[in-house]
Amino acid sequence: MAFHSLSYTESDSKIILIYGDSISAGYGMPKEQQWSEDLKELFLEENLNIGIENRSVSGETTGGGLARLGNILDQVNPHYLLIELGGNDALRGYPPKRILKNLNEMIDLAVSRNIRVFLMQIKILPNYGKRYQEQFESIYLKASEEKNVTLLPFMLDNIALEEGMMLPDGIHPNERAQPLIAQYVFDDLVPYLK
């Protein structure tokens, strides 16, 4: 009697492309401590045939992300796209309408290739002014509703204000936060992947 072990190769896996800025690029973390690596492990533990390709870039804006996306989709050929962009646009005070336009164009590009899109809500500090903060944060719901894509909660909601979870800059999560981010993202994604 022959026994066959069940193993998945990269070509068998459905690929999630993580496409974000320094938060998803694991700013200040060695690769093995980044939340995207922890997310890979969670998928393995649950025997989900999901691969992760992280093409996040520190400092990326929605405009830069839009400019790069076509080539990256050609290279990776993902089944799913998780967009975590916009924070750097807000840091530069870019108009919310421009950010929304860039997000919508990225979504359109992915959907035209039959890629399921997950859009991550981004939140910013109130020191940009309440009006700008509200306008900025509302674009994610607008984009998700206009384009009929899944809006995921901000991954730092339960982390950013927790003591001992952020780097000294107060913007980037530290090594203690990485597995928690992975678990939050995993819990938010899994219902849509089964």
Outline where the language-model segments fall.
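Active-site micro-motifs of SAM-dependent methyltransferase domains
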Residues: S24-A25, G59, I124, L161
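Bacterial N-terminal signal peptides
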Residues: M1-A2
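Alpha-helical cap/lid subdomain in secreted, periplasmic
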Residues: E10, G64-K194
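Serine-esterase "nucleophile elbow" of acetyl-processing enzymes
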Residues: L6-S58, R68-N77
